[in-house]
C-alpha cells in the first residue's frame, strides 16, 4: 500500500512512483515462506546447533528411549536400521604387506575387544549404532591394558551411553573453552571430554550427591554421532523428527480404543414409569440420585412393565481410523529412514516394483551413513587404535593403517537380473570383480583364495572337466564300460 512519500513522488514523477510500487511488490512476494502474517515464529530462531542441543537434547533423548522401549513399530524400525546398516559387521581387511598376520591378529583381538565382555568388536559396533540412532550419540572409550592381561592386543573398548558426558559443563578453563562437556583449545582443536566416574542415573547409593566430572583426553574417546549442522558438537536423536507424530498417533489409538470400549457396552434409555423397573432394595439409592436402573444380565429375560419405552444407544462408528494410522506410519517410516514394510511388517500392498524402489532408496541412505559417517568416525578409529596398540606391544613391526572395508551384503531383490547386470558391468569395464564382491559384503582376497583352492582340488581330483561341463549345461559323458566276455 503506497505511503505519503509514494503519493508525493507519484504526483511529480509518475514513472518513479510506479517503479517504487513494483519494487515494493516484488520484495513483498519474494519469499512467501517468510511472511509474518500467520504468526509463525520458530522456536529459538537463530540459535546455534549447540544452543539447541543444550536446551532440548536431554529431553529428546529420554523421549526417544521411551518410544524405543514401549512402541513396537519404533523398536522394529530401529532394529531394521541397525540390521541393514551394520548387519553382522563392517569388516576391515588390511592392505599391508603382512596383511595375513594383521587380519588374523585383528580377528583374534575382536573376540576380546569388549571391556564389558558382552560383545565382540562387531557386536559392539552394532550396539553403538543402536545407541547413536536412539540417543543421537554414544561414546567408545579406548582402554589400554597390560601385557600380563593375556589379550591378543593390550587394548579394549568400553561402550558408554552419552549420559556419561557432562552436558551441563560449559565455560572456560585454563584458556580452553568447554561446550556441552567437550573441551577445545584456543585454536578450536578438541582436547578432552568431561566424563562422570559412573553413569549419573546409576542407583548405587541412596545418599550420593551430584557426581563430579573429570577430563579424559580426546584421543582416548571416540564420539560417535552424525552432525547435521556446521559446528555441531553433539548428536541429536534420529527419532527427533517423529517424536511428536508418534505421540499424536498413540493418543489417537488410545482415544479409538476408549471409543470401542464404549461401543461394546450396551446402553439402554428407559422412559415412562421407570421406578417400577428397579425392584432391588440395594439399587434404591442409585435410582433416586442418578436414575440408574441396574445392569442387563447376559442371556437373561427381563420383565418390562407396561408403559415403559426402551431405546438402545448405538454409538456411531468413526470411519477413517485405518487410513489415518497407515498414513501416519508412512510418515513415521519416512522420518526414521526406513521403509513402511520394515516399520510395520505389513506386506499386503507391496509388489515387486514398489518394493525394489523403496529398497534402493533405503540402501542409498544406509550406504551414505556407512561410508560417510560410521566407517570414518567409528570403524577407522577402532582400526587405528588396534594397529597402534599392536605396534606398541610388539605384535606388529610398524604402523600400516591401509585397509579395505566390507559392508554387510544386500540380499538380491531379483537374483537373476541383478547377477546379469553385475556381470555386464564387469565385462564392460564399468566395475571390478573386487568392487562387486565388496558391495555384497564379501572379502575379495578371501573369495579369490577359495576359488583357487577349489579349482586346484577339482584339478587334482580329475573332476574339473565335469565341473566345466556343468557350467555350460552339458551333461558329462558316462565313462565307457569294459566289455564282458562270455564264459563257457
What are these regions (language model features)?
Residues 59-90, 94, 124-133, 239-259, ...:
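Short, Φ-rich (hydrophobic/aromatic) sequence segments
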Residues 2-18, 346, 356, 373, ...:
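C-terminal anchoring/interaction modules
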Residues 220-358:
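Extended, charged amphipathic alpha-helical segments
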Residues 12, 109, 225, 246, ...:
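Generic structural signal for hydrophobic core residues of well-folded globular domains
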Residues 102, 106, 325, 329, ...:
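Short amphipathic alpha-helical coiled-coil/interface segments
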Residues 96-103, 300-416:
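Surface-exposed loop-to-helix/strand elements on domain peripheries
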Residues 69-224, 396, 425:
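Structured, mid-chain assembly/scaffold modules that mediate subunit interfaces
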Residues 1-92, 486-487:
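N-terminal-proximal low-complexity accessory segments that begin disordered
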Amino acid at each position: 500500500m503506497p505511503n505519503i512519500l509514494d503519493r508525493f513522488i507519484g504526483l511529480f514523477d509518475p514513472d518513479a512512483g510506479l517503479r517504487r510500487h513494483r519494487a515494493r511488490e516484488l520484495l513483498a512476494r519474494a519469499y512467501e515462506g517468510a511472511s509474518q502474517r500467520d504468526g509463525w515464529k520458530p522456536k529459538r530462531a537463530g540459535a546455534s546447533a549447540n544452543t539447541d542441543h543444550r536446551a532440548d537434547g536431554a529431553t529428546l533423548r529420554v523421549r526417544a528411549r521411551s518410544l524405543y522401549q514401549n512402541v513396537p513399530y519404533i523398536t522394529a524400525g530401529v532394529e531394521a536400521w541397525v540390521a541393514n546398516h551394520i548387519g553382522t559387521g563392517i569388516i576391515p581387511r588390511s592392505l599391508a604387506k603382512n596383511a595375513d598376520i594383521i587380519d588374523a591378529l585383528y580377528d583374534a583381538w575382536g573376540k576380546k575387544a569388549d571391556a564389558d565382555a558382552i560383545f565382540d568388536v562387531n557386536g559392539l559396533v552394532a550396539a553403538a549404532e543402536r545407541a547413536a540412532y536412539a540417543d543421537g550419540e554414544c561414546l567408545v572409550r579406548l582402554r589400554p591394558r597390560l601385557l600380563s592381561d593375556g589379550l591378543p592386543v593390550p587394548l579394549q573398548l568400553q561402550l558408554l551411553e552419552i549420559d556419561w558426558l557432562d552436558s551441563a559443563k560449559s565455560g572456560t578453563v585454563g584458556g580452553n573453552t568447554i561446550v556441552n562437556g567437550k573441551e577445545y583449545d584456543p585454536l578450536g582443536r578438541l582436547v578432552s571430554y568431561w566424563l562422570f566416574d559412573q553413569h549419573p542415573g546409576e542407583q548405587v547409593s541412596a545418599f550420593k550427591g551430584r557426581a563430579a566430572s573429570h577430563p579424559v583426553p580426546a584421543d582416548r574417546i571416540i564420539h560417535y554421532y552424525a552432525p547435521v549442522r556446521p559446528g555441531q558438537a553433539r548428536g541429536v536423536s534420529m527419532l527427533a523428527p517423529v517424536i511428536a507424530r508418534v505421540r499424536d498417533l498413540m493418543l489417537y489409538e488410545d482415544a479409538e480404543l476408549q471409543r470401542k470400549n464404549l461401543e461394546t457396552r450396551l446402553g439402554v434409555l428407559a422412559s415412562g414409569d421407570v421406578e417400577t423397573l428397579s425392584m432391588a432394595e440395594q439399587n434404591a439409592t442409585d435410582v433416586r440420585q442418578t436414575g440408574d436402573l441396574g445392569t442387563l444380565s447376559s442371556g437373561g429375560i427381563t420383565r418390562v412393565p407396561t408403559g415403559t419405552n426402551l431405546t438402545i444407544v448405538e454409538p456411531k462408528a468413526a470411519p477413517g481410523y485405518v487410513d489415518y494410522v497407515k498414513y501416519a506410519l508412512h510418515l513415521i517410516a519416512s522420518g526414521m529412514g526406513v521403509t513402511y514394510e520394515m516399520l510395520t511388517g505389513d506386506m499386503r500392498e507391496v509388489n515387486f516394483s514398489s518394493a525394489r524402489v523403496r529398497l534402493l532408496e533405503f540402501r542409498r541412505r544406509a550406504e551414505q551413513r556407512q561410508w560417510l559417517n560410521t566407517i570414518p568416525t567409528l570403524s577407522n578409529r577402532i582400526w587405528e587404535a588396534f594397529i597402534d596398540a599392536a605396534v606398541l606391544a610388539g605384535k606388529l613391526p610398524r604402523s600400516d593403517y591401509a585397509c579395505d572395508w566390507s559392508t554387510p551384503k544386500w540380499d538380491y531383490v531379483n537374483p537373476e537380473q541383478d547377477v546379469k547386470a553385475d556381470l555386464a558391468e564387469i565385462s564392460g569395464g564399468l566395475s571390478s570383480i573386487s568392487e562387486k564382491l565388496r558391495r555384497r559384503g564379501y572379502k575379495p582376497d578371501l573369495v579369490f583364495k577359495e576359488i583357487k583352492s577349489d579349482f586346484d582340488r577339482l584339478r587334482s581330483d580329475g573332476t574339473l572337466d565335469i565341473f566345466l561341463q556343468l557350467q555350460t549345461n552339458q551333461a558329462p559323458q558316462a565313462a565307457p564300460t569294459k566289455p564282458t566276455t562270455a564264459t563257457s
